[in-house]
């Protein structure tokens, strides 16, 4: 009898992705020595996904719970992650997450409240939140990256929330998927689309009739001019 194949703990090397990253590094922004010391890496990859990390950019970010991609359906979501067209990959990923796979721990009001507080506690100091939504098994953000690398921000948000979540839910183990998905906002029109997508996600997923009805979203904080509190102070 053949011995079972070991479970892969890290994604296999994606030569196409590595080549893409190398090409982007040739012509796109390169971090200075000072920025490298702060851990800004420019274009890089972690497993299946390309990432861009630089100061002074706005990013549309998605990260999801550990069980939102069940092991029993690994072939399906690995096929999504290997999709060569980035926009197609993003649409398929969002559709998968909106189906609500896994335990959906963020549907617990106490857990969603904890997550929102963590996201906003350094807003205006280390970064600026343009939009956010906490869905049952994932989080969307539109965030201005200032002087702290995006990967450090995400690791901080995940680390704090996973400790509190595991205590609240009386569980152990991983709470978040290790990686995340980021897209650099190109211009004002792209920013508006990303904000609208983020805040309309509960409506699209049939969890609310209107964006403002979802309690864990930036939409409910906007005034009649669509401004968030920090925008009203400027």
Q: Whereabouts are the PLM-identified features?
A:
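Short catalytic/metal-binding and nucleic-acid-binding patches
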Residues: 1-234
